[in-house]
Amino acid sequence: MKLIKKLIILVLLTNVISACDAFLAPDKDNIFSESELIKDPSMAEGVLLNAYSNLPNSVNFTEVATDDAVSNDNSNNYRLASTGGWMATNNPFNTWAGSYTNITYINLFLTIVDKVEWSNRSDWQNEHYKERLTAEAYGLRAFYQFRLLQAHAGYDESGNLLGYPIAAGLITVNDDWRSYPRASFDDCVNQILSDLDIAIAGLPDVYADAPNDNTIKADYDKVYGSRFLNRINRRAAQMIKARVLLLAASPAFNPANDLSKWEAAANAAAEVINVNGGLNSLVNNRLEYYLNENNADIIWRKDYTNSRNLETDHFPPSLYGTGRMNPTQNLVDAFPASNGFPISDALSGYNVNAPYTSRDPRLDKYIVYNGGKVKNTTINTIDGAKDGINMVAGSSTRTGYYMKKHMNQNVNLTPGNLISQRHFQTL
């Protein structure tokens, strides 16, 4: 009997210890092997979707670093950069870490895309899924490389025009970055264009459902249908190509003024315009494209969001905003008269006593000036008004002007009656 009791106790202790081991054992982490990724198409696609989730989702007001605008925020990074505070630890133009993180996701995806069964419904779906996702990956990689080129290209101490280290393959933590020196500017441009050519060849013009009489409608919609709206498409890739070529032709990177580069940029831009309907299809009112969900001129944008962040930052203080970005007189004077002549030309008819009348209509749409309106409210920036120069610390204009562009006039910041509105962010 005593032996039986001892055996029972031993079994119970063994079970308790096993239970403790199971309880104390760490759960499986969120890191998956390649073999696990390729078994699950949703998980494999998620690697690429990481690069989508990190696309820019707001407006960067870099004008504060130029003579076109100032900020009333003493800690604004662009203000600091323009006043001697531009450092490696405080670089608002930096896209290095973010771009390479996304390029790494993309390169990882490209190593597995051919190994995944993307659809078991039909061979057509499987092959076209793979083709489209591969093209998306190359298009996104080109986009992030373009951001690197914009932010980090320049001349070294020897006068060589350099770009960024080209990472065309997967780089791991065990790789030595010293084996990836900065490539020449031209090599970077060629790498981006090569990626874009692959993207353009494999992407649809737009994502849209097939007509009902299409014999492969079910298959087509599954791969190229409207549910993929806002993913990179052929037109977006062509648009990026045009911008890359324009950057390469610009005086900053084309000091010899090679006209063939300008020609290439012009031809690429014309191609984008033509595939989007041509010049005659441009929307007549292009002043507020960022407020219109269905503006045909927008080639690629992110999903709209309901928010009031922009208005909170930039409405005048009388409308409960903090008036962060203030256009300068230099920018205001750049808007010509309504007849097209610069206001410095006598033929413009510019009246110094009525400086905002008979001006280019974009002035009223983009900038709040004294006597201008926001939300049908007249804004007074002189005579000691609340919206006047430096009247409210950290909220009032420093120049006599407020920003109006990108603001949704239907947003209400009145305490107790807050109203958010949609904003459409173009890429």
Placement of each model-derived feature along the sequence:
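Surface-exposed intrinsically disordered loops and tails
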Residues: 206-225
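Acidic, serine/threonine/proline-rich low-complexity intrinsically disordered regions
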Residues: 183, 239, 250-267, 421-427
